[in-house]
Amino acid sequence: MTSLPKVLFLMGPTASGKTALALDMAEHHNCEIISVDSALIYRGMDIGTAKPTASELARAPHKLIDILDPLESYSAADFRADAVREIEETLSRGKTPLLVGGTMMYFKTLLDGLSPLPSADDAVRAQIAAEVEARGWQALHDELRNIDPVSAERIHPNDPQRLSRAIEVYRISGKTLTELTKIKAESLPYHMVQFAIAPQDRTVLHGLIAKRFQQMLAEGFIGEVETLKARGDLHLELPSMRCVGYRQAWQYLDGEFDHATMVEKAVAATRQLAKRQLTWLRGWPELHWLASGDEGNLDKLVQQSR
């Protein structure tokens, strides 16, 4: 039996029922909710992110939502630092931290730590961009293959962001991305009990995703995106505006396609997100699975987290 303080993870794809289960857990079992969602961090992005409603937040406050303006960026390292602070504060109140969300990279940084990668260097990036202009991405990929064949095998020549970053890391640090990612931060001093919730039938999940997007539209999602566009300082290259649904609604408002196409593209993008989330979870160690909609989920969560 571990003497470490207990921390609960409740993971799952979008639209799987995480919030409802977390609210029940927080209300009845001395838990406090910490959000693990890279979209819920942004203020003014409520409908399209399925942010908990005012009444839900009154039942159980959520930490790490509405902490940034959509213009600001937020890294996995930022999340880890914020989450550890919230976990410690929750434990100090004699409560159990319940981390809920679908941003798997954030959960992974809590479990595995972060590799000590160097910060971006504008001068090195400019040099790489000039070389690409002169020689092309394939030449850069050939260079990566010579210095770091493992990363070159994983990174496609047509993935400029990751390819450029791998070269940049080597030029700044003198170490390859493969070498640095093997170095992990010290593990956190908690006993992590991990759950995932998802429908057993993927077609059910697809139906829930489509239904939820229609509900968002009925609640005024397009108006929400219009308000964000009207600010004048936001654009589609920002991480906030790359959230599923927002990009497609923005492009619709720009006249790039009609309403029906926007709905189709947004639902398809959300399905792709759910597929990636499930892919992460299928390879996740020490995971307790719950079926979406099962009336016994709360009891299972309580019993298996003891």
UniProtKB/Swiss-Prot annotation:
User: What InterPro entries would the database entry show?
Assistant: Dimethylallyltransferase, IPT, P-loop_NTPase
E.C. numbers: 2.5.1.75
SUPFAM superfamilies noted in UniProt: P-loop containing nucleoside triphosphate hydrolases
Residue positions annotated to bind ATP are G12, P13, T14, A15, S16, G17, K18, T19
Q: What positions are marked as the site Interaction with substrate tRNA?
A: T103, R125
Enumerate the residues binding substrate: T14, A15, S16, G17, K18, T19
Q: Could you say which enzyme class this protein belongs to?
A: transferase
Q: Which Gene3D superfamilies match?
A: 1.10.20.140, P-loop containing nucleotide triphosphate hydrolases
Asked if Signal is a keyword of the record, the answer is no
The UniProt annotation puts the region (Interaction with substrate tRNA) at: 37-40, 161-165, 242-247
Q: Which UniProt keywords apply?
A: ATP-binding, Magnesium, Nucleotide-binding, Transferase, tRNA processing
Catalysed reactions, semicolon-separated: adenosine(37) in tRNA + dimethylallyl diphosphate = N(6)-dimethylallyladenosine(37) in tRNA + diphosphate
Under Gene Ontology molecular function, one entry of this record is: ATP binding
The alphabetized list of GO BP terms reads: tRNA modification
Q: A Pfam family for this UniProt protein?
A: IPPT
Required cofactor(s): Mg(2+)
The record's function comment reads: Catalyzes the transfer of a dimethylallyl group onto the adenine at position 37 in tRNAs that read codons beginning with uridine, leading to the formation of N6-(dimethylallyl)adenosine (i(6)A).
**PANTHER family assigned:** TRNA DIMETHYLALLYLTRANSFERASE
Report the family membership: Belongs to the IPP transferase family.
The subunit field of the Swiss-Prot or TrEMBL record says: Monomer.
HAMAP family given for it? IPP_trans (MF_00185)
- Which named protein is this? tRNA dimethylallyltransferase
Which organism does this sequence originate in?
Shewanella amazonensis (strain ATCC BAA-1098 / SB2B)
